[in-house]
């Protein structure tokens, strides 16, 4: 009693009443306090043992006590466990009481509480005796039941107990075996609640592999047909769920799957069990559940189908397909439940492994659902759903038979492509990886052949795929871990990137394969529905070019970056097969693409792959891919070489066969290959072919600047190879010998030369070749190779130089532009040639022959090269060598084509141009030797055989003759003039040329006319000066000459200057030349008195000439102005000698003042121009004050005094000297101090260095015309 009071003391009223309800007042005072729970709720175990079985206690109170006990177990597990386990007998008794209460109560809530309390106590105590006691009670209860009507609570307890303690399953089966019979009774009892409990318990028993094995016979003989019928006829969700739970456990085992899917193996007793249905099959039952509207049942059904198929899709899928299960699974893909969609995808992924799935066209009807489901799921955040959907899509795309079209419309194909595009762009790597696999399967011809082929969509998909891969690669690179501790993570990241890159490349390879397959499909070339006038965009050609561009800009860089860290054979196999496919996809770009690959070291890369992975029989697939890639790349490079002739079809066919057999055999590293190439031992056919292949690979690599082997070692190896061929009496294929020569030339060190035996061997090989072009490769070092050895140069120098200039592509016109500022940099090829010319001048003779005998384009290149060489190497004296050889060429030409030299060779003008350049190159005056005199004779003879229309020959010839006259000593001038005057043909030609002066302005003869007039003036001066014999007189009409000056041609200032030069010479000779005769033009009027004095000129001609000179001076052309002043000086001298009054009259014309001041207005200090100074001197000499007054002379003197005389040219200073001398002689220098200052300034400058400006070159080529400035000026 005291204990009871103590327990209730100090508690509030309601709480005290609640705790009192937990105690059995009649007996509690007798109970030991140790049975009282020390915390709230204040339970007394002894009271519970007396209260719960007492029939006098209300059900509500008992329920309350059980609820509080359960709550205490949850909240104070350890205290309650200690309380119950104080005495094992008490514990067992308490369990018996609870079990008795469970079996006697019909109230479901009370039984549930009893079950929960029993389960918690049993699991918490973990006492074997307690568990065994409870199992015995349950077994006893079931055995004593006449009917299964009241077995629900016991069965439920057993099921939950086995669920809580899985090890009990084995014990129940082994020690309570007859319990199974009671379970079968429960299954046939007409209560779905009891059946659900039995199924639940069965499910827990079969979850144990040991129990399942022991119950296999029970299942076969008794349970299976009954269970399947119950599942088929189940009405309550509880029974359906528990049946499916049992089914899921059964389907874990192959044995039960075989039994369920193949009912033929069941015993007769099983088929005769009451309630069983022999016609019920699992696929039909599960199909029924799939058709239900309950999502849980649908998901469970899909899981069961999956569980069956996991064991063997090949055995069991057909049963589900025949039951039309796929149709309903496809329908569920449109569900809003992510779990159901995932389950359906998982199930379908297994079903597609069965070919029957496709033959029944399930994919054709279901692909739209798959695509839409994929599109919808990608908008969710369920990564597993993304992966499963993509996996299903990839399996369908991969396994769909080619003869059954999957996409029946282009719109559906487009939607599928866009869904994949979104998936490959996913930031989740696993999703993107699955999308890559699906993309690879999607890019199949039968999937894309529905017209029109949407190349634009395919391109967008590939771009997304490649960009995602590039982004992933960059992300890994930027997150590269530091330190040794992270090396494992780094290796994992590299491996992960390699797998992703491999999947990307496989997708790209599928696109390449698709492009190749579409090449034979006319309907796939472009969109057939495009209007004829519309721009065609979606074309196979554009798609193919995109593939090439994408590979070049994305695939190759990604693979090369990956190779820096690791090399994966499978990845490289796919990569090289892509490059191989691109040769076929874009055939018009295969040569260019091959060259780019070769220059990017892909020959080296492929050989290293073969050496590393393909030795022996390992990685045979990679070896084949590497060999195929090298084969096609080499053929592309050899069939379209850069600066060399392509091989013939026969050669290419032989090389093709050679590479096809030899490349798969090459798997050695570079040092081993060099050693094999150097082997001088006897070589069998296969070994020799392998040597040929190695040599060709080195050759192509070196051509494209991929020098991955030592030049010195390769140089020795090639020599040994050629000597080995010579020893065995073999002649290599032309392409192989071509490669050998090229490699020897490239690898030869400047200080290292070939042995005489090697040169002899090379020459013997060359002698068997009909044309050097067959083994020529354009390179400066190859040119050096042939010209360095006299034995080779004497035989092949001419041909190799001809080939070299033929293939040269340097900008020769730019080199020949002497007017450009500075000298343009020489190409490397010409640098080598010029070095050879400096060291071996005899090469110049070959070049001269080339100018004469080669095609015009080639000869023009040779000419410009020689010009450039001669301009830049003025210290090299090769003039005599060239002139002598040129003389021989010219003599041969005149002998062979004497009647018509213009038809001898189209390159003759080029030779003559070079000859004139050689003459111009002589800066100082030199005596003409015998060769020079012979050349003058031959050139004049050549000119005499030409007509005025042979401009190309005559222009350089006239230039040569003119410069020869003006660039030699006076004695040589006289001899040269005599030789030329003796050429009657030349004189007749000049007469014809002078008569053509008034031809049309646009005629190409203008430059030639300039040369003709200059030559005539020169001949006339030399003949008059030396009283030389004249063999042919030149007749010139004075009126025509004056007319040409009065009406000059447009842009023909030089022609006017040349005519004035001729007139000046004639005036100085007083028209008494024995060479030139002035003839009248038609009927002439009777001469006046003045005309008689001026004869042979008439006054009208004088006026015409003066007016012409004034008009020409106004043009302000420097050269023409000086020619005009010189002619005016000669005219006034001529007039002054015959009639001083007329001379004064001409000099004092008012128009002269206007002319002078027009010239003075040309700019600041224009009076210091030499022609103006000479003109003022002339007017001062004739005291023409009306033209230039004393005040104006003073202004000029003042300007001269202020000018910096050191900046003036020699010509200007000479004119200034003449001006001052004229003033002094006339006493016009009134200011003596100024005169003395100016005179001192002039005298202080030495004549040769009186100018700070560099002396102007006297001999020039203006507009193609040879000109001597001093000749025109003076």
Swiss-Prot record:
InterPro entries: ARM-like, ARM-type_fold, Immune_Signaling-Apoptosis_Reg
GO biological process: meiosis I
Cysteine disulfide links: none
Tree of life domain: Eukaryota
Cross-referenced Gene3D superfamilies: Leucine-rich Repeat Variant (1.25.10.10)
Tissues where the protein occurs: Expressed predominantly in testis. Weakly expressed in spleen and thymus. Expressed in the ovaries, Fallopian tubes and uterus.
Keywords: Disease variant, Meiosis
SUPFAM superfamilies xref list: ARM repeat
Associated disease: Hydatidiform mole, recurrent, 3: A disorder characterized by excessive trophoblast development that produces a growing mass of tissue inside the uterus at the beginning of a pregnancy. It leads to abnormal pregnancies with no embryo, and cystic degeneration of the chorionic villi.
Name of the protein in its database record: Meiosis inhibitor protein 1
Species in which this protein is naturally found: Homo sapiens (Human)
Taxonomic lineage: Eukaryota, Metazoa, Chordata, Craniata, Vertebrata
Gene name in the database record: MEI1
């Amino acid at each position: 009693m005291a204990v009871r009071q103590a327990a209730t003391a100090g508690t509030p009223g309601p709480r005290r009443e609640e705790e009192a309800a937990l105690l059995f007042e009649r007996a509690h005072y007798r109970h030991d306090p140790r049975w009282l729970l020390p915390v709230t709720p204040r339970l007394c175990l002894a009271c519970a043992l007396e209260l719960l079985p007492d029939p006098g206690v209300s059900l509500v109170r008992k329920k309350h006590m059980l609820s509080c006990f359960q709550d205490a177990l949850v909240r104070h597990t350890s205290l309650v466990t200690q309380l119950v386990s104080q005495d094992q007998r008490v514990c067992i008794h308490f369990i018996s009481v609870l079990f008795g209460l469970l079996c006697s109560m019909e109230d479901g809530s009370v039984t549930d509480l009893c079950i929960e309390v029993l389960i918690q106590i049993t699991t918490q105590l973990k006492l074997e005796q307690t568990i065994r006691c409870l199992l015995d009670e349950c077994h006893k209860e079931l055995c004593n039941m006449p009917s299964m009507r009241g077995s629900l609570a016991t069965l439920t307890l057993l099921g939950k107990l086995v669920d809580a303690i899985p090890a009990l399953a084995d014990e129940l089966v082994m020690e309570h075996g007859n319990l199974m019979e009671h379970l079968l009774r429960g299954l046939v009892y007409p209560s779905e609640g009891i059946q659900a409990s039995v199924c639940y318990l069965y499910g827990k028993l079969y979850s144990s592999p040991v129990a399942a094995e022991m119950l296999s016979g029970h299942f076969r003989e008794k349970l299976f047909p009954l269970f399947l019928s119950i599942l088929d006829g189940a009405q309550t969700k509880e029974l359906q769920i528990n049946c499916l739970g049992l089914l899921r456990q059964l389907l874990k085992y192959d044995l039960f799957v075989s039994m369920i899917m193949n009912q033929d193996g069941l015993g007769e007793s099983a088929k005769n069990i009451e309630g069983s249905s022999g016609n019920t099959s699992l696929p039909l039952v599960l199909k029924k559940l799939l058709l239900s509207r309950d999502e849980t049942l649908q998901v469970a059904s899909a899981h069961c189908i999956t569980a069956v198929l996991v064991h063997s899709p090949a055995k069991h899928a057909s049963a589900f397909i025949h039951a039309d299960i796929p149709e309903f699974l496809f329908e569920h893909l449109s569900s809003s439940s992510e779990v159901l969609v995932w389950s359906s995808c998982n199930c379908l992924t297994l079903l597609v492994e069965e070919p029957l799935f496709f033959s029944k066209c399930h994919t054709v009807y279901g692909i739209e659902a798959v695509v839409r489901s994929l599109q919808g799921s990608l908008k969710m955040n369920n990564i597993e759903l993304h992966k499963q959907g993509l996996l299903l899509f990839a399996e369908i795309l991969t396994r769909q038979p080619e003869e059954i079209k999957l996409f029946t419309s282009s719109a559906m194909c487009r939607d599928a492509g866009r869904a994949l595009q979104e998936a490959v762009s996913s930031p989740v790597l696993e999703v993107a990886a699955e999308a890559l696999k699906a993309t690879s399967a999607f890019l199949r011809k039968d999937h894309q052949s529905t017209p029109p082929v949407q190349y634009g969509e395919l391109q967008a998909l590939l771009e997304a795929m490649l960009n995602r891969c590039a982004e992933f690669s960059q992300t890994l690179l930027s997150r590269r871990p530091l330190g040794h501790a992270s090396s494992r993570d780094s290796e994992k990241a590299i491996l992960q990137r390699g797998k992703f890159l491999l999947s990307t490349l496989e997708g790209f390879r599928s696109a390449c394969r698709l492009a190749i397959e579409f090449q034979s499909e006319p309907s796939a070339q472009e969109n057939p529905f495009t209007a004829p006038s519309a721009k065609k965009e979606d074309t196979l050609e554009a798609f193919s070019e995109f593939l090439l561009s994408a590979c070049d800009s994305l695939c190759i860089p990604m693979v090369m970056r990956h190779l820096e860290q690791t090399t994966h054979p499978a990845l490289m196999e796919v990569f090289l097969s892509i490059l191989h496919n691109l040769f076929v996809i874009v055939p018009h770009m295969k040569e260019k693409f091959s060259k780019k690959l070769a220059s990017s070291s892909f020959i080296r890369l492929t050989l290293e792959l073969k050496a590393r992975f393909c030795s022996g029989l390992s990685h045979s697939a990679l070896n084949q891919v590497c060999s195929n890639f090298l084969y096609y790349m080499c053929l592309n490079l050899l069939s379209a070489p850069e600066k060399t002739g392509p091989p013939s079809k026969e050669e290419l066919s032989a090389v093709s066969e050679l590479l096809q057999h030899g490349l798969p055999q090459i798997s050695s590293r570079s040092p081993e290959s060099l050693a094999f190439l150097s082997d001088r031992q006897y070589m069998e056919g296969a070994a020799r072919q392998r040597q040929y292949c190695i040599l060709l690979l080195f050759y192509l690599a070196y051509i494209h600047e991929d020098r991955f082997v030592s030049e010195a070692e390769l140089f020795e190896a090639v020599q040994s190879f050629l000597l080995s061929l010579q020893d065995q009496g073999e002649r290599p294929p032309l392409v192989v010998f071509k490669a050998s020569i090229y490699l020897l030339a490239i690898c030869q060190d400047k200080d290292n030369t070939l042995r005489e035996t090697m040169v002899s061997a090379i020459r013997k090989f060359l002698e068997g070749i009909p044309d050097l072009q067959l083994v020529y490769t354009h390179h400066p070092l190859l040119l050096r190779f042939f010209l360095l050895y006299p034995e080779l140069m004497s035989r092949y120098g001419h041909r190799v130089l001809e080939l070299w200039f033929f293939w040269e592509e340097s900008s020769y016109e730019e080199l020949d532009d002497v007017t450009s500022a500075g000298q343009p940099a020489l190409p490397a090829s010409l640098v080598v040639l010029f070095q050879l010319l400096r060291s071996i001048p005899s090469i110049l003779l070959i070049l001269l022959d080339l100018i004469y005998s080669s095609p015009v384009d080639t000869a023009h290149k040779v000419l410009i090269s020689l010009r450039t060489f001669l301009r830049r190497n003025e210290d090299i004296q090769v003039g005599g060598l060239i002139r002598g050889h040129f003389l021989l060429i010219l003599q041969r030409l005149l002998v062979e084509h004497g009647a018509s030299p213009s038809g001898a060779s189209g390159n003759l003008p080029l030779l003559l141009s070079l000859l004139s350049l050689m003459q111009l190159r002589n800066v100082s005056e030199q005596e003409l030797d015998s060769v020079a005199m012979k050349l003058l004779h031959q050139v004049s003879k050549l000119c005499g055989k030409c007509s005025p229309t042979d401009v190309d020959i005559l222009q350089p010839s006239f230039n040569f003759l003119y410069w020869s006259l003006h660039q030699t000593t006076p004695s040589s001038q006289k001899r040269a003039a005599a030789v030329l005057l003796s050429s009657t043909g030349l004189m007749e030609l000049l007469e014809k040329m002078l008569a053509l002066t008034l031809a049309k302005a646009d005629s190409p003869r203008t430059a030639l006319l300039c040369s003709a007039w200059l030559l005539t003036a020169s001949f006339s001066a030399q003949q008059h000066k030396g009283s030389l014999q004249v063999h042919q007189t030149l007749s010139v009409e004075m009126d025509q000459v004056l007319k040409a000056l009065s009406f000059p041609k447009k842009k023909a200032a030089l022609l006017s200057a040349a005519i004035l030069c001729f007139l000046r010479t004639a005036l100085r000779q007083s028209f008494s030349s024995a060479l030139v005769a002035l003839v009248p033009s038609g009927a002439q009027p009777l001469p006046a008195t003045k005309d008689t004095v001026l004869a042979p000129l008439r006054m009208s001609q004088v006026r015409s000439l003066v007016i012409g000179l004034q008009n020409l001076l106004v043009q302000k052309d420097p050269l023409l102005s000086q020619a005009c002043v010189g002619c005016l000086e000669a005219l006034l001298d001529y007039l002054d000698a015959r009639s001083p009054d007329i001379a004064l009259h001409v000099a004092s014309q008012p128009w002269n003042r206007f002319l002078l001041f027009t010239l003075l207005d040309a700019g600041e200090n224009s009076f210091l121009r030499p022609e103006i100074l000479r003109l003022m001197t002339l007017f001062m000499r004739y005291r023409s004050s009306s033209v230039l007054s004393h005040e104006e002379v003073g202004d000029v003197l003042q300007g001269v005094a202020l000018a910096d005389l050191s900046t003036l040219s020699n010509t200007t200073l000479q004119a200034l000297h003449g001006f001052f001398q004229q003033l002094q002689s006339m006493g016009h220098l009134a200011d003596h101090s100024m005169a003395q200052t100016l005179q001192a300034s002039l005298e202080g400058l030495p004549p040769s260095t009186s100018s700070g400006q560099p002396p102007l070159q006297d001999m020039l080529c203006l507009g193609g015309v040879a000109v001597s400035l001093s000749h025109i000026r003076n």
